[in-house]
């Protein structure tokens, strides 16, 4: 009986895994390296409307969040998450360990390998533009997310969305420009570049960009201007 209780507790721990980083919980020394991961988590987090007919269970929400975060290829999520995790582990005071829950969930859910924080990585992190599509329905789950430290080979990822909401965060290189958020709603299929995320197995697909492609192209043009 006790073994069953432990097993059920482990399953329950997977549900409601918040993949967002609380801005107030990120030490100032880690702001730059963690900013892309924080923005990605905020973009990807699903907030179902109460009563929405979308099989809106906690488990589905976790799966949608995890696929969005773990398979993102707009920047090196695997490396930045590990760098952020290392920095926060070093800088977060012992009496504020709950601040690590978000980044720990990302590392665990995505199966990313730990690494040592290098302050030199912050310069490249400051120039990162985070592009992501928030998933909203079970029909968009096309990727199997497997936690653990063993990388799984992947080629390319794609996901089809009947009603995809593309949210784009544009950030400057630290020159004082404000972040800009844009969102475009439109159908179509989004194809990503090779994803090297550990623990992620993505089905191969060959497709044409839909309306979301316009937002991405515009984002890069504006991003180049800001930089």
Curated annotation (Swiss-Prot):
Keyword set, alphabetical order: Cell wall, Glycoprotein, Secreted
Protein name: Protein CAP22
Record keyword Ribonucleoprotein present: no
Glycosylation sites: 55, 72
Keyword Secreted assigned: yes
Chain positions covered by the region annotation Disordered: 143-162
Taxonomic lineage from the root: Eukaryota, Fungi, Dikarya, Ascomycota, Pezizomycotina
Record's subcellular location: Secreted, Cell wall
Highest taxon, organism lineage: Eukaryota
Principal place of residence: secreted
Cellular-component GO terms for this entry: extracellular region
